[in-house]
A protein has these predicted regions:
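Short linear functional motifs in flexible/disordered or boundary regions
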Residues: 64, 75, 100-104, 154
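Non-catalytic linker/capping segments at the edges of enzyme domains
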Residues: 1-79, 108, 116, 129, ...
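Short, low-complexity, polar/charged sequence segments that are solvent-exposed and flexible
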Residues: 71, 81-86, 104, 140, ...
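Active-site helix/loop of acyl-thioester processing domains in fatty-acid/polyketide metabolism
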Residues: 80-113
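Generic secondary-structure microfeatures
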Residues: 67, 89-92, 124-130
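Extended, positively charged loop/linker patches that create polyanion-binding surfaces
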Residues: 100-132
Length: 211
């Protein structure tokens, strides 16, 4: 999807055929068949997810991102811890909750954006074990702990990916059991552990009332 197509999509410019195919994927498949640009409202400079590699709609997700030059600018070439948390949140509570809400309401993200604003509610503990530089591909592995009333809570981990590894191939047979145990190769380097990352889709009317 080009940026021009994305803007048309977010503006509600999907054709009926495209919308039908999108909804078919929402109801019958999972996030792996979608690009993050189709699910996340963030523009290209603030979107911190490149690819969805594995997804179980009610259990969790594995997604990846590779920090770009703009992500480490003026920060010694290091991808900041706060951006790691943001990347994890986009991959988990935002992507997964958007998918489930679209399924529930039989709609697309562009229709959701007219009703709700995604909001970061709270963060539990975050423990950093390693660092990430420009070009270091990492995965966010997220476990869904709670989802109700458009609010989602996830725990998870961030791992640096071994150089040259094909993530689509590696995770094609991944399971919910392995997800819960973080059962992956020791070649992955643990970067961060995250707990109780919480977000909620809030009605736009509530924001307008507070103005």
């Amino acid at each position: 999807m080009t940026e021009e197509q994305r803007q048309l999509y977010l503006a509600g410019g999907m054709s009926e055929e495209e919308r039908s195919l999108f909804l078919k994927g929402i109801h019958e498949k999972n996030l792996v068949m979608f690009k993050p640009s189709q699910m996340l409202l963030h523009g290209p400079t603030k979107r911190l997810v490149d690819t969805y590699h594995w997804h179980s709609p009610t259990k969790g997700i594995v997604a990846s991102y590779t920090p770009k030059g703009r992500d480490v600018e003026d920060h010694f070439g290091i991808f900041r811890g706060v951006d790691q948390v943001e990347a994890f949140a986009q991959a988990t509570i935002v992507s997964c909750a958007t998918f489930l809400e679209c399924r529930k309401q039989n709609c697309t993200p562009d229709q959701l954006k007219d009703k709700f604003i995604p909001a970061f509610i709270s963060i539990g503990n975050v423990n950093f074990h390693y660092y990430l530089e420009q070009g270091d591909t990492f995965i966010s592995i997220g476990n869904i702990k709670f989802y109700k009333w458009r609010q989602m809570v996830c725990d998870g981990r961030i791992y640096k990916v071994p150089a040259g590894l094909n993530l689509d191939e590696y995770f094609k047979d991944f399971t919910e059991e392995r997800l819960l145990k973080y059962d992956i190769s020791k070649d992955f380097k643990l970067v961060a552990e995250l707990f109780d990352i919480t977000g909620r889709a809030i009605l736009i009317e509530l924001f307008k009332k507070s103005e």
